[in-house]
Amino acid sequence: MRKKQKLPFDKLAIALMSTSILLNAQSDIKANTVTEDTPATEQAVEVPQQTAVSEEAPSSSSKETNPPQTPDDAEETVADKANDLAPQAPAKTADIPATSKETIRDLNDPSHVKTLQEKAGKGAGTVVAVIDAGFDKNHEAWRLTDKSKARYQSKEDLEKAKKDHGITYGEWVNDKVAYYHDYSKDGKTAVDQEHGTHVSGILSGNAPSETKEPYRLEGAMPEAQLLLMRVEIVNGLADYARNYAQAIRDAVNLGAKVINMSFGNAALAYANLPDETKKAFDYAKSKGVSIVTSAGNDSSFGGKTRLPLADHPDYGVVGTPAAADSTLTVASYSPDKQLTETATVKTADQQDKEMPVLSTNRFEPNKAYDYAYANRGTKEDDFKDVKGKIALIERGDIDFKDKIANAKKAGAVGVLIYDNQDKGFPIELPNVDQMPAAFISRKDGLLLKDNSKKTITFNATPKVLPTASGTKLSRFSSWGLTADGNIKPDIAAPGQDILSSVANNKYAKLSGTSMSAPLVAGIMGLLQKQYETQYPDMTPSERLDLAKKVLMSSATALYDEDEKAYFSPRQQGAGAVDAKKASAATMYVTDKDNTSSKVHLNNVSDKFEVTVTVHNKSDKPQELYYQATVQTDKVDGKHFALAPKALYETSWQKITIPANSSKQVTVPIDASRFSKDLLAQMKNGYFLEGFVRFKQDPTKEELMSIPYIGFRGDFGNLSALEKPIYDSKDGSSYYHEANSDAKDQLDGDGLQFYALKNNFTALTTESNPWTIIKAVKEGVENIEDIESSEITETIFAGTFAKQDDDSHYYIHRHANGKPYAAISPNGDGNRDYVQFQGTFLRNAKNLVAEVLDKEGDVVWTSEVTEQVVKNYNNDLASTLGSTRFEKTRWDGKDKDGKVVANGTYTYRVRYTPISSGAKEQHTDFDVIVDNTTPEAATSATFSAEDRRLTLASKPKTSQPVYRERIAYTYMDEDLPTTEYISPNEDGTFTLPEEAETMEGATVPLKMSDFTYVVEDMAGNITYTPVTNLLEGHSNKPEQDGSDQVPDKTPETKPEQDGSGQAPDKKPEAKPEQDGSGQAPDKKPETKPEKDSSGQTPGKTPQKGQPSRTLEKRSSKRALATKASARDQLPTTNDKDTNRLHLLKLVMTTFFFGLVAHIFKTKRQKETKK
């Protein structure tokens, strides 16, 4: 192994910086252990750990395939939360002075929970369970007002219940937290205590009146006892699902009436869950226990920065456990009013104007601050008037943290950033050196900018004020359908800027569907409690079924005022939960089979019918009016706008439902007049959906409604895989932006930031440099023991570098436009295999690769990959934009393990979408196999005067020549370093007299340092020492630098020629024709097609210029490890496991990329000297 060498200053600096970055990344990732509830698009995230970063990225996407949803969308993250998350002793609250006994819900109750509480109580005597990533189990909000009404009166009562059900674990914490257990079995203290604490507070928090907060936290069921169950990914998704399945069973057995699960895995299908988990859901349902889940914060296919393509309508990402039919899955919306911090300004007419603010490091309350306008805060001149004042800055152009840092540097005492979008959501700003900062709406920002009196005062007590966004679905809230093709989410609840408990007796606002779910869980618990008295003859499972249907039926369908249409049922479910309407309901509506309160029509034509059943539980006949809304997706260019498009509404009709009975209603829909235009925008089909709405009077408010969804087309058989990058007309894919100057440029992994870049459908292979091939042939078995400045790298089949520049690769094509994907499976590691990489647009199953010969017979079949998850995002926090499938690697051998004959083969990938009724699909690639060794020149002459080497003949190859070069190797410090010389225009080579090291030292070169290397486009390589060429003996053993024959040669292996085969092995029979239609025995006169750069592989732009490979010399080992790990990325989205794994790879790659940049820059400077 190579000894540790002394690093120059620049290398050392980069190494230290990269190590620091990597360690920070590892720390951050370990803290973020919750799965689906990742950073919300807007202000906060359900898992705010330690310190996060807020990045305001400027609107910059010029590629039509990858536009941001809105300008500057990528920065919506969470600000610093400086809470110490260590476990704390129970809080002492008696000495804290009382400031208010008014609850948060007293001020703002958009879901009307108080009305239901008045009827059903506040959960006394009830047990509720929260399954989450971690809790502060000693928070001050965990208390009961009257312990005598508790289900478990003592620890002994709990122990008896545990014993009755064989539960031997779990602890009694206090009267409120009757049970706590960590099901993760990792033996670690929960890093994230905040998320589960916040969720539990919304469900069942009951803060004391003596709290320091201005208003008291009271959850939906404040008097219920809590079962806190920690579950975290430790050993993969399957084990994770089994752990929370056990928690579900235990919660049911310990008497929970409702279970909240604010976590999950985006885009995963319910069908792929372990059987134990499915049985746990069924068990809870059979016992009448409601499971409420969050829909997730992954928005849609493409994440929060890309809009889904209009050609691919299966863009839903709701995953598990939310995809389970038995769960109630909750989306997030922002109500029109919110409890918020406020600031006051005096307007020109001397009126006080209050405005909502979202602060990081709050300003001193009740103090009048002067402020000055600072444009977008990008340049020094913007801040000329801010010293001693607050800087008022518009959002955009640069990161939030840079705006704040610039203002601080200019002497500002604080920062106010106002939105650059109307009706936007509030954004929590980053903590920059404890600088007071706040975010305000665009409307209020413009008011401040134009106000004559530049003074603002921040108020001490929060108030309820209208939101800038109005009532709107949260942009981060995950869309349905599920991967299985089912309707989710079911219902929506407030999830934007929700104030609740966090660790260490503190309270904070967080956003996400994790905040929406526990509110609905509490309402479900109370509604079932009401039904125990109202419907005593029902079984618990019957009451659960009724409560779910009533809650969905009584939800209010949310309307998008901007689009003049209802938000899609695939985004909001049945609508906004309304506890008051649910509690008072005597009617509800279901599908025609009374299965659920949503209608899934599957595939429909232009004309169809929606049939629903109206149920009347009252003792009187009920007269209602009904109509249906008809809508679809709005399309913006080539993308879904993630907004509704209204088509039309049916006329109001009247119906009477007898007492204690039900009646069906059928609504005919005719959308034929829209089909031509809609198919022009969405060629693969589109959703026709809406709500059947009921009123007691057409002029009054909606009483109840039911969502319906149909797909005009064949949803089950939509394409599951993005077309190969080779077929792209402009060189781009959904996640890949083409080089505008060379659309066929397709760089390999190399030293590039590949993890976020090389995401498309293609075949990968491996490029092995001559030095490594030579070392292996000389007996080095472990590639890690090879000393070389060159590396083995993963590239894409059909791509080739320039002869004198291997920093970029380009697709080379046959005359028919197909890529020249050729391999030579001779064991030298150079283009020996192909492996499938795909960007999946949908979940699929049973992926298998097979190879067919020219007769169509299958010669090889891979192992089956049973589950494939759509590549719904290109984000290290979730999943990459493509997946490499290790099982699909084909080494050019048949099913018996023998190398196939030379020729052209079809490499086929087969897979089936998991949607109901889907048929198998496949994608084909043509692959040339050719093991024919090139025939190189056997003699040459050398002119010492101009140092020109002239070969006696041109190389002869079966495939076109890829590169013909002279290699030379010298020692740079203790690393053998290889560089290449390309031929001059006349075919000669100019040999240098000396080489220059990285430190500027010169190294004399001897003739024995030079080797003639020829490589064809299938990866066959032959090489001959130049000394042998000059003597006219190509098979003479290579001599060392003393011009003496080495006295020892490898004894373990027979001598091999330049083809990588033993001398007694004859070349395989040549194929009749290659993919270009030319006979392979035609020699170099048959020139390959030019690539997109206008050059053929092998043509040299500069005369005799050595090619610089020094940028690779520092990373050979790291890259080998990186490529191997990248090829084995799992096909499931194990976020907790993958995030750390991916970031380690990326940060390592980033480090070597920086090193490469320094090397390359240095060499460029040397070349110019």
UniProtKB/Swiss-Prot annotation:
Region span, Disordered: 33-111, 1028-1135
Catalytic activity: The primary cleavage site is at 67-His-|-Lys-68 in human C5a with a minor secondary cleavage site at 58-Ala-|-Ser-59
SUPFAM superfamilies documented for this protein: PA domain, Subtilisin-like
Ranges where the record places region 4 X 17 AA tandem repeats: 1036-1103
Main localization (coarse): secreted
Prosegment location in residue numbers: 1133-1169
Enzyme class of the recorded protein, top EC level: hydrolase
Pfam families for the chain: CHU_C, fn3_5, PA, Peptidase_S8, ScpA_C
Pentaglycyl murein peptidoglycan amidated threonine: residues carrying this PTM: T1132
Record PTM text: Cleaved by SpeB protease; leading to its degradation. Degradation by SpeB is probably strictly regulated to preserve integrity of C5a peptidase.
Coiled-coil stretches noted in the UniProt entry, renumbered to this chain: none
Enzyme Commission (EC) number: 3.4.21.110
Signal peptide as annotated in the record: 1-31
Name this polypeptide is given: C5a peptidase
Organism annotation: Streptococcus pyogenes serotype M3 (strain ATCC BAA-595 / MGAS315)
Gene name linked to the record: scpA
